[in-house]
Structures are given as C-alpha cells and as structure tokens.
Amino acid sequence: MNASDPAASDSASTSAPGTSSSSASGSTASASAPSAPSPRLRAALETFPPYVPGKPPRQVEGLESFKLSSNENFLPPLPAVLETMVAHATNPALYPDDAALALRQGLADRLGVGLDQLVVTTGASELLVALTQITSDATTEAIYPWPSFEMYPQTTGLVGSTRREVPLTAEGRHDLDAMAAAITEDTRLIILCSPNNPTGPVLRDDEVRAFLDKVPDHVLVALDEAYWEFATEPGRADGLGLVRDYPNLVLLRTFSKAHGLAGLRVGYAVAHPPVIEGLLKAVIPFGVTDLSQAAALESLNHWDEVLERAGEIAQTRDAFAAALREQGWEVPEAQANYVWLPLGEKSGAFEDACVEQAVAVRNLGAGVRISIGEDEALARVLEIAERFRVEHFED
C-alpha cells in the first residue's frame, strides 16, 4: 500500500550526502568497490511489516488540504496547556523526573487508584512494547483481534511470539468466543482494543467480564483504551472497574487523542502492582520529558473540558457516520474519533480519490479509516464518497 509513497521514491533516487553526481550515477570506482557485509539480524523481523504512519495530504492547487489519516485531534490543546508548555520549555540539559511523580499523583487522584498501580510512558505504544517484553518470547503465543492497531503484530512479532490473529465479526467487533477458543497452554498475552482501531465498535462490560472469566489467571490481558473518551455507547466496558476486579488485566490509555497531545508522547497504564513492577523494568528511563509531564498534568486538571470537547467530536462523528449511511454505505458503530468504510479491494481507489482532492485518509487494505476533522474536510469526503459510490457501486 506504500509503493507510491513519494518519500520512498525520493530516498531511492537521491544521492547520499557527500557523494558527487558521478559516484551516485554509477562511476567505475563505486562499481568496483566491494559490497559491505550484511549484519545478521533476527529472523523474526521477516515475519511482520514495519509500522507505517498515516500519510500527509497532497497539495492540490486551489484546495485546502486536510489530514484525516492519523486519528489526530484536529482541535489544539487547551489554552492553559499551551501556557504550561511555554513555562516548562526551559532547560533541556536536565533529565526529567523519571518517576513522573506529579503526573502519576494527578492520575491516581483522578482515577482513584494507588501510585503503585500506575506507570507513565512515551505514549501507549511504548506500553505495548514493554508488555510483550515482560510476557512473551519465541516459546509463547499472543492473541489479538484483526484488523486492529497495527502495532500489535509488530510488538508481538518482535519478540518472536507466535501470533494468533482472530478475525473480527462482520460488524467490526471482537469475536470474544473465538479469542477464548484460541487460548492454549502457550498463551501469555491477549490484547483487546475498545473502541477498536480501525473499525470503531466498543466492547461491552458484560462481555469483557465473561471473557476474562475464561482466561487463565497467568495470562496477561491488555485492554487498549486509547480512544475511550470518545465512546458514548451505553454499557461500554469500564476499564477501571475491570482492572480492580481482575489482577491479570492491564489498562492502556494515552494523552494523544482526546487531550490533543500526540506530539508530546504521554501514555499510561493502570494495573495491579506486580504488573506495574514488571513494566517499570522494561520501559525507557527518562522517556517522558518534563514539558510533556507538565502539559499532561495541566490537561488532566481540565478533565471536564477535555471530556466536553471529546463529546463534541463524538457528535460530529455520529453526524458524519449517519451521512455516509444515508448515501448507502455500511458503516460499523463508530465510537472513537474516526469512521471505518469496509471497502475491501476498492480501498486503494477510494484513497486515490481522496488524494486527488487534497484529503489524506488511511487505507488499511480491508477498508479505509477516516479521522474526524474540520467540517470542511468531512464535507469534502462526503462529496468524494457520493461520487465514488455512483462510479464504482451503481450501474
């Protein structure tokens, strides 16, 4: 899906720094130079692709460009958060507080958990890496839904774990019965994603509890709630309540989405102390900068405003999804800050149609994920979708 990526073609055709045009074009000297030996890398690297971020939009003359490919919050951080960032942009020569004590205390007070139940990391992505490191190796198995967040196969594959990808239902939901049936003696890690990225539905609290009751106590279950603030469906899973009741559950959350701090890289996990102790041995020391910690804490102090803005984005999402359904599209129940179109083999053509109109969306093969953005951006996507449906699905 990235064969047409301009960055890829540019890097392949540009001379290396410090080389002349003659050497770059294949002079006698460079042609006769011996090839460098290839380092011997782990075979597991051949079993999964690298993570590919959402592409930026193409610049089209006469059109404002919009990036709807990375599930970023199109609203800026709250003014108080921006002021805090300026105040803490002081001396980068000093290490930050490795324990992130002030932020952890703020989270503990807000969430009603103990300090020993929290770890703060450079985004929730680092938590996924750390979780696989403390649970998995080449002798173990990991289970997760698919399609889901693209880092799941990357992080579990990196440690050599056997990956059990359990297909979603036709409605884009977790098939928890199939996931439970996939558990073996070698299973050490199970990942759940609610709302699921990229399809959008949430897990219900009762179905998660029924699932966890089937999971052996020694198997760690991670509940990825990166988008939980946008979810409005009644009966959705209560991650905090579940963690209190299940010692083998770890809750993953982030400041990247609803808080609008994706560029500062702050995530956190809530779990029972033994799990947190293990994670602390695997996370990067001093990973979360002082500025990032301060900004996240300030945003946390404006919790109600953050949730209010997330609610506004959810209303826009619902209206956008409804408009797509009115055009005749099948759209799964969207509960995050994006909408999923299960286009299958036509996903690439739809992405191209958006690119031509200066809109970047995320083509994931089985479908296209469209992040919620500015009203003008969503209106343009609706126009593209309507034309595309006429051209590709109607006689």
Give short role names for the model-derived ranges.
Residues 2-11, 17, 28-94:
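N-terminal "arm"/small-domain region of PLP-dependent enzymes with the aminotransferase-like
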Residues 248-324, 329-332:
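PLP-dependent aminotransferase class I/II
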